[in-house]
A protein has these predicted regions:
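A broad, structure-centric signal for solvent-exposed, well-ordered loop/edge residues
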Residues: 65, 73, 103, 107-109, ...
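Generic detector of short, locally flexible boundary/turn motifs and exposed helical patches
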Residues: 15-18, 60-64, 75, 112-114, ...
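Canonical Radical SAM [4Fe-4S] cluster-binding loop centered on the CxxxCxxC motif
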Residues: 91, 95-131
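Surface-exposed beta-strand edges and their flanking turn/coil or helix-capping segments
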Residues: 73, 80-81, 109-111, 162, ...
């Protein structure tokens, strides 16, 4: 049996099924534990010091307790504290990004996704670099400065080289109201070497959604 280790490079250790189940059980057992919830809210509170603002943060188990809480007044306290933390670190602003879908070719069979390989009811499209450029100009005209590029998992149609070419194209567009400042990337999990290539290309954030951490459900859905 794998042992939970959040710093491990092995997926089965940092995404550990036993730890996830135990965390959920712990949260359910403590979701109405007022004393514990109060202590967690206090722990999460931002603190001002000489160098700015710091926050102790919460462990995943502690965060799970707050997420499971069903006490209305404590939930309201969480909303207020969340806003306090947000203002302390980010100020009174909201950062938005626009999705840019590059390709819906995909070799996976995820049952919840319209891109899945058995779906014969959609046309498969892969943008050329000129089409990418046109999309970027259209998004800039709307006022967007940050994008999140999206692509299905297909090593033939959507190799990392294609993704990198698209990133370079996006950053190269200098339109009347400026250019794109940040390209976030939402593609399938890849190799360490490819992550390095993405970093060298100047991406902002790499996004990887895990629709479920329930092992049984994951196998059924994928």
């Amino acid at each position: 049996m794998s042992i939970y280790n959040p710093k491990s490079m092995k997926a089965e250790e940092f995404i550990n099924d036993v730890e996830i189940r135990e965390t959920i059980a712990y949260a359910q057992a403590n979701k109405n534990n007022v004393e514990l919830i109060d202590s967690l809210l206090e722990k999460a509170r931002p603190v001002k010091n000489g160098s700015g603002v710091t926050c102790a943060g919460l462990s995943h188990r502690e965060a799970a307790v707050l997420l499971a809480c069903e006490i209305p007044e404590k939930v309201e306290e969480m909303y207020k504290l969340a806003n306090e933390i947000k203002l302390a670190f980010y100020g009174n602003r909201i950062v938005m990004f626009a999705p840019l879908y590059l390709s819906n070719y995909c070799v996976n069979g995820c049952v919840y996704c319209p891109y899945h390989m058995k779906n014969k009811h959609i046309a498969r499209i892969k943008l050329t670099q000129e089409q990418v450029r046109a999309e970027v100009i259209a998004l800039q005209d709307m006022g967007h400065k940050r994008l999140a590029i999206e692509a299905g998992e297909d090593p033939v149609n959507n190799p990392i080289e294609y993704i990198l070419d698209c990133i370079r194209t996006i950053y190269s567009v200098h339109h009347k109201n400026g250019d794109i400042r940040r390209v976030n990337v939402n593609i399938a999990a890849t190799t360490v070497e490819n992550y390095r290539k993405l970093k060298e290309a100047g991406i902002g954030t790499y996004i990887l959604f895990q629709e479920t951490y329930n092992k049984k459900s994951y196998l059924e859905l994928h």
